[in-house]
Structures are given as structure tokens and as C-alpha cells.
Amino acid sequence: MIYAEILAGGKGSRMGNVNMPKQFLPLNKRPIIIHTVEKFLLNDRFDKILIVSPKEWINHTKDILKKFIGQDDRLVVVEGGSDRNESIMSGIRYIEKEFGIQDNDVIITHDSVRPFLTHRIIDENIDAVLQYGAVDTVISAIDTIIASEDQEFISDIPVRDNMYQGQTPQSFRISKLVELYNKLSDEQKAVLTDACKICSLAGEKVKLVRGEVFNIKVTTPYDLKVANAILQERISQ
């Protein structure tokens, strides 16, 4: 089976003085997360679409889904975990409980606050994860990347041609991700907050899928202004 998992577990601390997590803030009068969910609903390859939400916001998540989308049997709201990877695993535990996990089952995970992903990005993630087992969505680095080990002085300037900026979706063969995650110590789980890094450090090849510059993550007030500008431009076309 092919699952989508929309990660809406963040609290939005970088958004400033707002009274709700950033995924629920309005983007052209509709919550950001609704724009994201709709992109996945448009793809009929998904058997289930999981939305992972903070416990205290589960009812709100269900309410806005009902208001803006209506009934869809593919949609399921699941309680998130203490961090990103634990939220991914919360969704996987739900899948295991309800459907069991087959060796060829895959999951396409995506930030709820990246509302501008495209049908191409989703389809290429599905195709690539079915073939390779682990996938990351990236764009080429435009600016020079500076590395500093002490946050005071330059330690290294990597060759920009080899540098990429990570986006989402990140996609995985479920059985392999579970196997690798369960091998981690508590200390490793606290440090390895990116699921693709878990795969890479274990020697698994992670296939790259080309993202888009406009596939932005809305985490700050400035990002929200940019997102509104992108949306208004599309509406006016």
C-alpha cells in the first residue's frame, strides 16, 4: 500500500506571537494545512492519508478538515510524537495496528506547512521510493554554504555544486525505516532528527528527487508573507 503522512506536530514557536500552531494559520482565508492536504487528495495513488497532529489540536484538525474538505475515507488524524521522527513513527504504528505492514508498503512524509508541493514531486517520490526504498526531495544550493564548527569562524566552504537544500516529501519503505529506527539508541534518536539521515548513516542509498524553489516551508511571519504572494500570483493568472 502507498501511504501519505502529513506532519502537523509543530508548535510554531518561530512564527511569533500567535495563538495556534503555524499549520492552522490562514493562507488566503484557509488554513495552511488544508492547502497541503488537498495536494495529496488530488493524487489517487494513495490508499490512506495520515495527518499527524499534536494531541491538544486533534479535534481542531478534524473540525477544519470537515469544514474545508468534507468527508473522505482516505483521511485519518493521528496523534503525533515528541519530535519529528516520533511523529513519523506514530503514523507507522497506526498503520501497523490497523492494516499490518507488508514489505512493499511505502510512506510519503511531508511537512504540513509546505503547501506548494506539486503533483510531479509527489508522483516522482512515489515512483522513486517504490524502486529505491528511501527518497529525499531537494533543490540545488544557490548560495555558498559555509561550515563553522564553533559558530565563530569558517571551518569549511564545501563545493556548491555538490550541495543541496533539503525539502519534503521524504519517502521510505516502511519496513526498512522501522528496522533502522528501532536499532537507534535513545541518544541517537535525540540527535538524528532527519529520517533520511538515519537511512544514510546506516549505509542505505537515498534517492534524490528534484524539488521546487517555491516549495517553501512556512515557519516565520516573513515566510507567510511570501506564501500569500505566491498564492495571489497563482490566483491572478
Swiss-Prot record:
GO MF annotation, one: 2-C-methyl-D-erythritol 4-phosphate cytidylyltransferase activity
Transmembrane feature ranges: none
Cross-referenced InterPro entries: IspD/TarI, IspD/TarI_cytidylyltransf_bact, ISPD_synthase_CS, Nucleotide-diphossugar_trans, TarI
Residues the record marks as site: Positions ribitol 5-phosphate for the nucleophilic attack: 160, 217
PROSITE patterns registered for this protein in UniProt: ISPD
Principal EC category: transferase
Record-stated family: Belongs to the IspD/TarI cytidylyltransferase family. TarI subfamily.
PANTHER family documented for this protein: 2-C-METHYL-D-ERYTHRITOL 4-PHOSPHATE CYTIDYLYLTRANSFERASE, CHLOROPLASTIC, RIBITOL-5-PHOSPHATE CYTIDYLYLTRANSFERASE
Protein name: Ribitol-5-phosphate cytidylyltransferase
